[in-house]
Amino acid sequence: MKSAVENLEPTRVKLTVEVAFDELKASLDHAYQHIAQQVNVPGFRKGKVPPRVIDQRVGRAAVVEHAVNDALPDFYRQAVTESELKVLGQPEVEVTGVPDTTSGELTFTAEVDVRPDFTLPALADLELEVDDVAVTDDDVAERLDLLRQRYGTLTGVDRAAETGDYVVIDMTATIDGEEVDTVSGVSYEIGSGNMLDGLDEALVGLAADETATFSAPLAGGDRAGEAADVSVTVTAVKVQELPEADDDFAQLASEFDTLEELQADLRTQISDAKVNNQAVQARDRLLEKLVEATDFPLPQGVIEAEIHRHLESEGRLEDDEHREEVREEATQALRRQLVLDVLADQVSVQVNQNELVEFLLRTAQQYRVDPNEFITNADKTGQIPSFVAELARNKSLAVALRDVRVVDASGNAVDLTSFIGSEETDAEDAAEGVESVEVDLSAAAEDDAEETSDEPAAEDTATEDEAAKA
């Protein structure tokens, strides 16, 4: 097989591939076997029809066509690998030459989007700032109040409602005089803002058995987003009474005998949470800094395909305003993905078998499916490379943070080793025989984009199987 690459744009190339007739032999043999299973020929059992009879009954040309369709995806992938292309999405394939029944070459072209070339800034030159981990008395008091609220009781009061009160309400929503929704006996904390826009303002000042009206877009149902006239009636006003913060409460709400012990434990919990948050902040801020520091063209075909997939899934293909919102999201998501792909290459990320298995088990649990069934299906549908690539992208940030200076708001160096590992821990994994999984970000990017394809079926054969995003 011979192949050549022509650069059409910074993010798009044209592959020209030539395949000698002899290289189609395996596909021709497979074509004969497949056709033998499909045809009924008197005197022969299914699957046992010899090639010469198939040539007579079906035609050698049909066998060659079957072989070409079967072989083309593999030859395309081989050409991509040999040319060291980082492809994104599906190719547009055009078969330009088909061998005759006994000789000739298979020739085809494939135009495909590719990852642009760009360089990331030197990691050793970067400095990231994260929050301090010092725990204040106010932090402990706030956490203690949250715990007290879990054990609080609601008591009715005979006065107008205020922010922070709990009210029991009945609501009716109408559009053009037609009742579209109604609820009754709902308990709501004024100021929480987790129901309709304008509800908090309408409730403040209402006493039991008083009613107010306001307008707001509906938050759910068949008429979601439409403006409605809402009538709300308060049937009860209640305040939350919290238990005293004392030793008795400590014994009620925890395993500790004294309030002092409970407060010490809360302080430890808060400190641990802040340390964890430092690692999250460092990861997010590293990605943000790398994206800001790089400028590169994006393949618009990949972005348009993602926009179409997103809008189609929501049934909003004609919503131009939402299209622009999705375009911005898709553009930023692709930019982050490409930065992570380059970073994974730069720091030579390895995903081991244990990490992959843990990820698959977590994902199966997330979707509430049997782990064995999920893993089997993922392998059968070709999703494993995408999962490995996603793990590699995430892991690349942790590995890269080893070379970046991280400080807290007070200027103190922050040690994230317990979260990001080290070369020593990597060596220990290798010594224990933890097998690494091959990371192919190019194939995974092709898989991810296949979901968005609108190409004809004949061209679909030139790509990997569809892969889900995890």
Curated annotation (Swiss-Prot):
Lineage top rank: taxon: Bacteria
EC number(s) stated in the UniProt entry for this protein: 5.2.1.8
SUPFAM superfamilies: FKBP-like, Triger factor/SurA peptide-binding domain-like, Trigger factor ribosome-binding domain
Keyword Cytoplasm: yes
Acidic residues bias locations: 424-438, 445-470
Catalytic activity: [protein]-peptidylproline (omega=180) = [protein]-peptidylproline (omega=0)
Function as written in the Swiss-Prot or TrEMBL entry: Involved in protein export. Acts as a chaperone by maintaining the newly synthesized protein in an open conformation. Functions as a peptidyl-prolyl cis-trans isomerase.
Protein's UniProt name: Trigger factor
Species the sequence originates in: Beutenbergia cavernae (strain ATCC BAA-8 / DSM 12333 / CCUG 43141 / JCM 11478 / NBRC 16432 / NCIMB 13614 / HKI 0122)
